[in-house]
Regions:
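Catalytic donor nucleotide-activated moiety binding site of glycosyltransferases and closely related
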Residues: 207-242
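Extreme N-terminal starter segment of soluble prokaryotic enzymes
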Residues: 13-18
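A donor-sugar binding/catalytic signature common to diverse glycosyltransferases
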Residues: 24-27, 246-289
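Leloir-type glycosyltransferase catalytic cores
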Residues: 293-308
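A nucleotide-sugar donor-handling region in carbohydrate enzymes
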Residues: 121-188, 305-308
Length: 308
């Protein structure tokens, strides 16, 4: 059985490692985090590369993409020689370009894919997949939760930068990390109102402060509901302007409430070692998300938020 050392998988020392994604934040964070971890072992400079799909390819499964990088459009980076020794790809739209890069470099570029590629794993030198995907293969390494670029150093820097901003908020300080609807979960206006009401009751019962951030998936209507209902004393609601305080929330908060739709945010909150509670949304039954949450609860990493 091979160890976790990349040399045991046939990898050579690297000068350059490309972190290749379609530009979505969740994909970038995973590719960056995995590429940085590889660089610490194998050497090399991490360079982030974007291959942003143009219409109509952005709406189609990765298998329908044209060959190589011909489906990449506005916002994409230049993809050409000199080629890297290692490509870390993440997301379905990065698979075709990663395989094309390896072919252009006559097999001298190794591909490490983060997440379940939903295609033949033999195309990659290594696949690092999450346990709830239940993926198997000779070149598959399984991890619990998603990979990310959060480190002790980045949290320390964020704490130093932002600590004065939240000094007036009471302790304990609870960070609320809210995503939104996806293919599995629905975050309706009614669910959002109930969520905000539960947060306020929890705040009153525990005399705590709240740090709240939402995402693009939250949607405008839900975002406005949260903003209006949570405009209360001892609540910091990030409105999206200026620098993103997300890592500061991770560094400074004493506990976390995270909406069920985001494996990434749950995994990043768990990295801190602080209590993490999951905010339920409509949906999820019988899906890989449900498997993920069961695994995390069974391992003692998370609990379900019940309103207090």
């Amino acid at each position: 059985m091979r160890s976790g050392n990349l040399t045991d998988w046939g990898f050579m020392k690297a000068k350059t490692i490309w972190a290749l994604t379609d530009g979505k934040a969740g994909m970038i964070n995973q590719a960056r985090g995995l590429a940085s971890a590889i660089a610490r072992e194998m050497g090399g400079k991490v360079v982030e590369k974007l291959v942003v799909p143009q219409t109509p390819w952005s709406f189609l499964p990765a298998g329908f993409w044209p060959p190589g990088i011909s489906g990449a459009g506005y916002g994409s980076d230049d993809i050409g020689a000199p080629w890297p020794e290692i490509v870390v790809s993440c997301g379905r739209h990065a698979i075709g370009p990663a395989v094309w890069i390896k072919r252009k470099n006559e097999g001298r570029t190794a591909i490490v894919h983060a997440q379940n590629p939903r295609t033949a794993t033999r195309q990659f030198n290594l696949v690092v997949a999450q346990s709830h995907d239940a993926l198997k293969g000779a070149n598959v390494i399984i991890v619990q939760g998603s990979m990310h670029d959060i480190t002790d150093g980045s949290l320390s820097a964020a704490r130093q930068k932002w600590s004065d901003k939240f000094v007036g908020l009471p302790r304990p300080l609870v960070a609320v990390l809210i995503g939104g609807s996806n293919k599995t979960y629905r975050m309706t206006a009614d669910v959002t109102r109930q969520m905000a009401d539960d947060l306020l009751r929890m705040k009153a019962a525990n005399a705590c402060g709240l740090l709240v951030t939402a995402s693009r998936r939250t949607g405008k209507e839900n975002w406005m509901i949260l903003r209006d209902m949570l405009s209360q004393p001892d609540v910091y609601f990030w409105d999206g302007d200026g620098d993103n305080p997300y890592q500061a929330f991770l560094a400074i908060a004493d506990a976390f409430l995270v909406s069920a739709d985001s494996v990434n945010m749950v995994s990043e909150a768990c990295f801190t070692g602080k209590p993490v509670y999951i905010l339920p949304l409509e949906g999820g039954a019988g899906t890989k998300f449900e498997r993920f949450h069961l695994e995390m609860r069974d391992a003692g990493h998370t609990k379900t938020f019940v309103g207090d």
